[in-house]
Amino acid sequence: MWPLWLLASLLALSQALPFEQKAFWDFTLDDGLPMLNDEEASGADSTSGIPDLDALPPTFSAMCPFGCHCHLRVVQCSDLGLKAVPKEISPDTTLLDLQNNDISELRKDDFKGLQHLYALVLVNNKISRSTRRPSAPDGLKLNYLRISEAKLTGIPKDLPETLNELHLDHNKIQAIELEDLLRYSKLYRLGLGHNQIRMIENGSLSFLPTLRELHLDNNKLSRVPAGLPDLKLLQVVYLHTNNITKVGVNDFCPVGFGVKRAYYNGISLFNN
């Protein structure tokens, strides 16, 4: 039988609502790391949050893909019906927006030479796989990647290991296997909401020692994922709208006294 204070605490935490993204450039400084705010709300305008490029002074780089808008170090190639990542992208580009196109895969040389690329947005494409080699010498050092509203059935295993934020919400991912997250030990935020995830293999989350936010809402999980107590920096967990029928006393916090970990800011368990 659980103590009443513990049940009350979990009930209060379970009412936490998802974060609301105000703008794509809403950086939050967290121990010196710029983090982009999340957008997990369904039905949101997929173009909201992208900078108003008309308000930015243009640069006169000769390298700008046909049909794209290039301002400063931002390249916006959205809504062009592109079937592949365009060529002739300036090597000093830091943000590349490719949302609302028909790109079906990421190939090994798509981003070759883009050593300063910080953020890549691939929302609402037809991406079902990535054929990048994990050790591809393309110099890509992404911090932020969003492949939402696509056709992924699993977590790609060949994305840059430099990622701090990976958002794969609104796909068709069904499971998280042990080796899926092996490369991504630097992740601070992982978004996997609105998928079809039924199973998370034990030990999968152990490869994410710096994780602070985990979004697993709107999936088909029947229990709280194993390994959450071991993530000492984890502060936010979204598990609402799943099929979770019970919560164990040790599902979120480590066993024993004197075990140091960050305090939770939010745990959402409603609609289970």
From Swiss-Prot:
InterPro entries: Leu-rich_rpt, Leu-rich_rpt_typical-subtyp, LRR_dom_sf, LRRNT, SLRP. Glycans are attached at S42, S48. Residues 17-37 form a propeptide. Residues 1-16 form the signal peptide. Disulfide bonds join C64-C70, C68-C77. LRR repeats lie at residues 92-113, 116-137, 138-161, 162-183, 186-209, 210-232, 233-254, 255-272. It is found in: Secreted, Extracellular space, Extracellular matrix. Residues 55-91 form the LRRNT domain. The two attached glycosaminoglycan chains can be either chondroitin sulfate or dermatan sulfate. Homodimer. Forms a ternary complex with MFAP2 and ELN. PANTHER family: AGAP008170-PA, BIGLYCAN. May be involved in collagen fiber assembly. Belongs to the small leucine-rich proteoglycan (SLRP) family. SLRP class I subfamily. This is Biglycan.
